[in-house]
Amino acid sequence: QAMGETQDVSLVRSEFTENLNTWIKLNNMSVVGVEPKIYTLPTKLKCICRNSKCNKPCPLAFSATNPEFAQVVDVDPRQLLRFMDSADSAQDSYLRQVFGCKSVQAEPTDFINCQKIIFQESASFIDGLEEASFENRYGVYMYTDYRLSATLKYNFEACRVTNPSTQQNYYLIRDAECVSVPRPDISEELLQHFKSVGDSCETARALVQQYYEEWMPELAIEGRPDLFGAILLTYCSVTEIPWQGGVLKGWLDTMCIGDTRTGKSQMAQKFVKAVGMGGYINGENARRTGVIGGVQRFGDSWVVTWGAIPMNDRGLLMIDEASGLEVEDIKDLSSTRSSGAVTLNKIVKGEARARTRLLWFSNPRSGRNLSDFYWRGFGAFQEFIPVMEDQARYDLVLSAAREDVDILNGIDVETHVNLGPWQALFSLAWSITSEEIKISKEVKQYVRETAKSLNEALGGGPLVVGVAVHEKLLRLSCAFAIACGAYDLKNSALELTTKHVRFAREFLEWTLNKPSMGYGDYIREFKRAQQKRADNMQFVRTLIAVHPAIKALLTATSFKGYQFQEILGIEKNESSKIMSDLITRGLLRPGSGASYIPDKLLMEIAKQMEV
């Protein structure tokens, strides 16, 4: 079959019997794993007769003296599979079968390299489940120069054949074209819509609300502008950001935790499906090997098979029902999410890039509602991932409670969003390099000042960490710059302004101070408790400095009231006042039998001050 005659077929349809031994095109195939072995196999075999005493009329008998009679056989693609992992005698056996003569011997004249690969269809629910297959398929890629790389997407020209030895199906691939994220052909007219919205809005809420109203007919979910804004900003986030001579990660890691039936997953699924960019996995039936990667047996070799995060490098992945992932699995993702690379050191070693924008959606692990947690959404988030290091990896954490939306007004679904400009905008964001992002000295100073004030207001917890606040602000600022159409086509530059940084701060405060999130209340209580602890420590240190003998009492597990007066050698009134102050501050509590029990803090300070 000629190259031009191949037809586009889905992976499912390629398995119909009518497509056996037929060259077809398989588009958007993701290479999940590659075998490290390289095979070099003959594609043409010259036939030689090894029987000098043969007197039968045969063209091979004259080929030694008459080269024009030489017989060269093109090896059938199916037979290449037979030659793999076989001795040279397999080639002789093949020719003897073709000629029906035991005297024929093979002499290879042309060769091709072959690489065993594991691949799957890269389509998720975007193209409809009935036409997509998520199971791994086995292939053999024929090449002369460069091998295929794992985690990349390709358009294959392939033929499904059966292995003559085992009858197992393989896809023999003669041509593979890499499908990279192309730099969009974007114009000033296309960017103008985003620029006009960005210029007209003075607050982050106004910008998000205007885009939300534009998308409302497509999403059909009301009352969730903060969630829409988070999805939009995650899509608009860049890959790398220049900062102080180095490069920071630019892709956003967003988490939404909420009650069931609040539309959080539905909104994200509709957005991903409409845009047609990004992958999807369900955490309920996924483990670490499916998210990061693992090793798989392929013939007599072990092959690294990469998971959903590295397979969506420089793209976006939505993890739905994330509560299905174990805490240990999420902890294992920590290094990957911060560095943008995956390293597997198992039976075989493998490395892959994983600069993947992540959208996590989850219900509370315990099945309770957000309103049942003391700290509302933040309490449910702490239950979801109790390790502070992993909590800090999330750039945005949002809540979606039932009580957030009172009444649904209904949506006019007659209009649809114009997807072309949005797809071009997201492709632009995903392909921008760190050299194209321009941050002036004035903006850098404003970022530092904003980070400092934000840390004073909301610092102390895992979601606003003092030394890393500027990184979170920069990621959100660059995403807002993209959403505002601030890309200069003439100079190929994304200019960051103080307005974008202000929008980033506003959005962070909006999500964290939301009543159903409860993070602002948690931080205020945390800071009050910290201040109280500091005051108590100062009070106890002063008390010990004035009455050194009190250390003997405070290091005891309990003591009687009269012992306080006797050991300190003070009047009863003064003794009562000191004990009253300690009880009021929560440093001393009454026990059974007229005894008093010192608080742990009190005992710690007393022990620290022992010489």
Predicted regions and their residues:
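Intrinsically disordered, low-complexity regions enriched in proline, serine, glycine
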Residues: 166-169, 370-371, 489, 591
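OB-fold and OB-like single-stranded nucleic-acid-recognition modules
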Residues: 1-211, 327
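Short, glycine/acidic-rich hinge or "gate" loops at secondary-structure transitions
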Residues: 168-170, 244-249, 488-495
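Conserved ASCE/P-loop NTPase catalytic core
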Residues: 21-64, 207-432, 436, 544, ...
